Amino acid sequence: KKGVLWWSIYRILEEKKRKPKYLILENVDRLLISPNTQKGRDFAVILSSLDQLGYAVEWRVINAAEYGMPQRRRRVFIVGYYKNTDIYKRMRKSKPMDWLFSEGLFAKEFKVQQPQVLFDEHYLDYISIDSDLKKVTKSFNLDNFDRVFKNAGFMIDGQTYTTSVTPSFSGELAKLKTFLEKKKVEEEFYITDDDLEKWKYEKGAKAKT
C-alpha cells in the first residue's frame, strides 16, 4: 500500500543522521488527487513530511509520449533538495513562475509552453501546508475541492505553489522498433508450448467465488 510505503521511506530518512542531498520519488499521477473523500491529502502529507525533514520539493506529472517516447504513461515525479544544497538556496531566491517554467530541473529538461500572463498570482495556486502531520491528515481539503495539486509545483518551508503546464516538444517522435534488440533473442525469453496455457490462465480474467 502506498501509505505504508511512504512511512517506510519517511522513517529511513528520519533516522539518517546525514540526510541524502537529493531525493527522487515516482508514483502514479493519481497520488495528487487521492483519497477520493479528501482529494490531495496523501500528497499534502508527503510534502509536509519532507518539509519537516528539511527538504524543498518540486514535482511534475510527465507523460513520456508527450516528449517523443513510444509509451503513453503518466507518472508524477517528485524531487527533493536538502537544505544544505545549492539548489535549495536557489529555489528560495527564485520566483515561483520562473522556477516552474524556466529555472527548475523539470522546466529545463522537460520544456513547457510559456504562459502569457502579467502577474504570477493570476496563474499560480498558493497552498499553505501545515507542519503538523496530524492536522494535515484530519483537515486538509475537507471541502474536497477537485485537483488542489496541479501537474506541476514546488514547495519550500511549507509554502506551496502549483499550476498546470502544457508540454512543449518539437523533436523527432521515437518508434518502438528503435528500442528493440536487433540481435537474436535467447531461447530463455520464449514461452514454450507446454507453458503457454499456464501463462494464458495467469494473465487472463478470473471469476471471484
PLM regions: where:
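Class I S-adenosyl-L-methionine
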Residues: K1-T209
